[in-house]
Swiss-Prot record:
First-listed, main subcellular location of the protein, grouped into a coarse class: cytoplasm
Annotated pathway: Carbohydrate biosynthesis; Calvin cycle
Keywords per UniProt: Calvin cycle, Carbohydrate metabolism, Cytoplasm, Hydrolase, Magnesium, Metal-binding
Protein name as annotated: Fructose-1,6-bisphosphatase class 1
Subunit structure: Homotetramer.
Species of the source: Rhodopseudomonas palustris (strain BisB18)
GO cellular component, one term: cytosol
UniProt subcellular location: Cytoplasm
Name of the gene this protein is made from: fbp
């Protein structure tokens, strides 16, 4: 652990004199600076006029916007206006913010993930993805495997920034005394054998059969096919779920399901699934839709959705197998069925 390593030193050493890397570093530094102000704003809560009440408008994806969503979006946009960019994509904006078409990078971000948790004083965060700009190609039209950097900020008991520059994952925690991010962990690797899974089990009746099969294998415990007792987690905040996986292992599932509008889940590909998949893979994990690698997907629209299953490689591979080979299922009696453990 290198507690003397600050985020700014880390990005400076990464950038050197390379034009593309300098632009990436500038974007990271701008988002980090905005996140410090966002952390202070969230920390003051109602004292700063922060509530979970809806503003009355909706974002491009149809979610009701809260005042804090808009304020965080404005703070990050203000920081990014100071750097060279070709395009910006925000969850809160229906269209792209266009900059210099000759700039080396474009940035996609979710300014405040999990904002519905604000009223309950739970974890929220910021997610971002930085991609190269190729002249002659539409911004953000390439698959996720072209990302140059990705990260997320967790506004929890501590404010921490998780970052990959394509060579592993490092975690920095905000030192509020001098408003700097300092490294607490380098080259994070996801633990392989943690018996935890995270999914919103209330949607069981809407899931595809492979997802049901996987969850039922976990719930069968030590006497079931996985031969161990699993714990279930669900926070409702993607950044919190991802941080737990990085530090403790396990698997997170937000699959598509049969509800209208949920065929591809609820998470957005560009600024949620792509950056999280990049981070998780760089930490030795896997990220899939259940059928294919998330980083192989290219977005056809800036707010396109995709299922996201991420975590320890063995668990991600297991659910991919269940999708691709239904005969691999080892449990036929549904734990949630008429004769199951969750009978009503």
């Amino acid at each position: 652990m290198h507690q003397g390593l600050t985020l700014s030193r880390h990005t400076n050493e990464y950038a050197g004199t390379d034009k593309l890397r300098l632009a990436v570093a500038a974007a990271i530094d701008a988002i980090a600076a905005a996140s410090i102000d966002i952390s202070e704003l969230i920390g003051r809560g109602p004292l700063a006029g922060i509530t979970g009440e809806a503003q009355g408008s909706s974002n491009a994806d149809g979610d009701v916007q809260k005042d804090l969503d808009v304020r965080c979006d404005e703070m990050i946009l203000a920081g990014l206006q100071k750097i060279p960019y070709a395009a910006l994509a925000s969850e809160e904006s229906e269209t792209l913010v266009l900059g210099d078409p000759g700039a080396p990078i474009s940035v996609a971000f979710d300014p405040l993930d999990g904002s519905s948790n604000i009223d309950t004083n739970m974890t929220v965060g910021t997610i971002f993805s930085i991609v190269p700009n190729k002249q002659g190609e539409a911004p953000f039209s390439a698959p996720g495997n072209v990302q140059l950097a990705a990260g997320f900020v967790v506004y929890g008991p501590q404010t921490s920034l998780v970052l990959t520059l394509g060579n592993g994952v490092d975690i920095f925690t905000l030192d509020r005394r001098d408003r700097t991010y300092k490294c607490i962990r380098q080259q994070v690797q996801i633990p392989e054998h943690t018996a935890e899974f995270a999914i919103n089990a209330s949607n069981h009746r809407h899931w595809e059969q492979p997802v049901r099969d996987f969850v039922e294998e976990c719930l069968a415990g030590a006497d079931g096919p996985r031969s161990k007792d699993f714990n279930m987690r669900w926070i409702g905040s993607l950044v919190a779920e991802a941080y737990r996986i990085l530090t403790r292992g396990g698997i997170f599932l937000y699959p598509g399901d049969s509800r209208p509008g949920y065929g591809d889940g609820r998470l957005r590909l560009l600024y949620e699934c792509h950056p999280m998949a990049f981070i998780i893979e760089q930490a030795g994990g896997g990220a899939s839709t259940g059928r294919e690698r998330v980083l192989d997907l290219a977005a056809k629209s800036i707010h396109q959705r995709a299922p996201l299953i991420m975590g320890s490689v063995d668990k991600v591979q297991r659910i991919e197998l269940l999708h691709n080979d239904p005969a691999a299922a080892t449990i036929t009696a549904p734990l949630f069925g008429h004769r199951g453990l969750f009978r009503v």
